[in-house]
Swiss-Prot record:
This is Phosphate acyltransferase. The gene is plsX. GO terms for biological process: fatty acid biosynthetic process; phospholipid biosynthetic process. GO terms for cellular component: cytoplasm. Catalyzes the reversible formation of acyl-phosphate (acyl-PO(4)) from acyl-[acyl-carrier-protein] (acyl-ACP). This enzyme utilizes acyl-ACP as fatty acyl donor, but not acyl-CoA. Residues 349-370 are annotated as: Disordered. Gene3D superfamilies: Isopropylmalate Dehydrogenase. It holds the Pfam family FA_synthesis.
Length: 370
C-alpha cells in the first residue's frame, strides 16, 4: 500500500472519502481528474483511493492538488459492468469496489464514491454495511432538474431494486422527503407517487395501497402528499419528491439523460447549419451556455444509496472528471452534515412512534432546519 499521508476519518473540518478508482467506463484517469478538482474545491477533504497501485500512483503523483491528500489502497481486481451482483457478492473480495465499501464499514472513511456497476455496488454495500433497522429495500435517490424554485426535484428509486411493494414505496416517501427537506432546504416537501395517471382508479393495485400508506404517514414524515403524478410532473412544479420503483425510475432517468443529449445535439446542428446560424449562435452564446448548464447531467451526477448503515454515492459509469467531482462534492456535503446518522434517527423514530426525528442535513450554505 502506498500512502503519502495518514489521516483519521473524523476531525475538525476534516472528512475522509473512500473512492473506487477503477470501476468507471473511462478508467482511473477520469476519477483522478475528479479527485484533483475536488481537492481544490474542498480544502478539508482527504481521499482513500482504491485500485491498481501501479496505475494510480503515477497519476496521483502528477497532481499537485492531491499531494498529502490521498492514500492508495491496492486492490488488484476490478468489478466490470458485465459482472453479476451475485458473483460479486461471493467473489468480490480483493476488488476496488469491495475495498472502497470496506473503508466505510471499518470507520476509516465517512462516505464511499464509485462509478462502478450499480447492481454490484448495491449488493456489496448491503452485504458489508447492512441495512438500517426497519428498512426492507434500500433506494437510490437522484436530483432531477425541475421548474421548482430550487431548480431540482428528488426522485427515488432510480435503480436499486426493480421491485417495490406498497410498504417499500411508503418508506421511499419518508426517506425521499427527509433528503429533500434538507438537501433542497424545504420545510415541508411535497411528495408525489408516479403513476400512469392522476385519477385514483388508475394504476396497479399496489400503487393504490401505497397511496393510502403514504397519505397516512404524511404527518409523521413531515411532508405533504399530493397524490398520483404522471411522467410530465417529474421536472415540474407539482411536487418536490417523486416516488416510484427502481425499474420505472431508472428508465425515466436514462430517458431524461438521453433527451438532454438529443436537445444539445439538435441545437448544435441547428446553429452550425450555415453562416447566419453560426452568427446567431455567437450572439446567443451566453443563453446557450446557461441552457447547457441547466441540462448537463454531469452537474447533478451522483445517486445516494438511502437505507444503509453507511453513506454510498453512485456516480454515473460514464462520468468524466467534472462528473466525478460533482459526485464527490455531494459525498462531501453528506459527510459534513452527518446526514446518515440523522436519517437513521428519523427512520427509527418514525418506526417507534410514528413521529418525526430532528432534521437531517442542511443544504449547502444554509442553516440546518428544525
Amino acid at each position: 500500500m502506498a500512502s503519502e499521508t495518514a489521516f483519521q476519518a473524523t476531525g475538525a473540518g476534516r472528512i475522509v472519502i473512500s473512492v473506487d478508482a477503477m470501476g468507471g467506463d473511462r478508467g482511473p484517469a477520469a476519477v483522478v481528474a475528479g479527485l484533483a478538482e475536488s481537492a481544490s474545491a474542498i480544502p478539508g477533504a482527504y481521499f482513500i483511493v482504491h485500485g491498481d497501485e501501479a496505475h494510480l500512483g503515477p497519476m496521483i503523483a502528477k497532481r499537485k492538488d492531491l499531494k498529502g491528500r490521498c492514500e492508495i489502497r491496492h486492490a488488484p481486481r476490478v468489478v466490470t459492468m458485465n459482472d453479476k451482483p451475485s458473483q460479486v457478492m461471493r467473489h468480490g473480495e480483493g476488488t476496488s469496489m469491495w475495498s472502497c465499501i470496506e473503508s466505510v464499514r471499518a470507520g476509516e472513511a465517512t462516505v464511499a464514491v464509485s462509478c462502478g456497476n450499480t447492481g454490484a455496488l448495491m449488493a456489496v454495500s448491503m452485504i458489508r454495511l447492512r441495512k438500517l433497522p426497519g428498512v426492507n429495500r434500500p433506494a437510490i435517490a437522484c436530483m432531477w432538474p425541475s421548474r421548482n424554485p430550487g431548480g431540482f426535484n428528488v426522485m427515488l428509486d432510480v435503480g436499486a431494486d426493480i421491485k417495490a411493494d406498497a410498504e417499500d414505496l411508503a418508506q421511499y416517501a419518508l426517506m425521499g422527503a427527509s433528503y429533500a427537506r434538507n438537501g433542497l432546504s424545504l420545510e415541508r416537501p411535497r411528495v408525489g407517487l408516479l403513476n400512469v395517471g392522476t385519477e385514483e382508479h388508475k394504476g396497479r393495485a399496489e400503487l393504490k395501497v401505497a397511496q393510502d400508506l403514504i397519505s397516512a404517514n404524511a404527518a409523521a414524515g413531515a411532508y405533504e402528499f399530493v397524490g398520483f403524478i404522471e411522467g410530465g410532473d417529474i421536472p415540474g412544479r407539482r411536487c418536490d419528491v417523486i416516488v416510484t420503483d427502481g425499474f420505472t425510475g431508472n428508465v425515466a432517468l436514462k430517458t431524461g439523460e438521453g433527451t438532454a443529449k438529443l436537445i444539445s445535439d439538435f441545437l448544435r446542428e441547428a446553429f452550425g447549419a450555415n453562416i447566419l446560424s453560426k452568427m446567431a449562435a455567437v450572439l446567443a452564446l451566453g443563453s446557450l451556455k446557461r441552457l447547457q448548464k441547466r441540462i448537463d447531467p454531469r452537474r447533478v451526477n451522483g445517486g445516494v444509496f438511502l437505507g444503509l448503515n453507511g453513506t454510498v454515492v453512485k456516480s454515473h459509469g460514464s462520468a468524466d472528471g467534472t462528473g466525478v467531482a460533482a459526485a464527490i462534492a455531494l459525498a462531501a456535503r453528506l459527510a459534513q452534515s452527518g446526514f446518515h446518522e440523522r436519517l437513521a434517527a428519523r427512520l427509527a423514530s418514525a418506526g417507534r412512534a410514528g413521529q418525526d426525528a430532528p432534521d437531517e442535513m442542511a443544504a449547502p450554505g444554509r442553516s440546518e432546519k428544525r
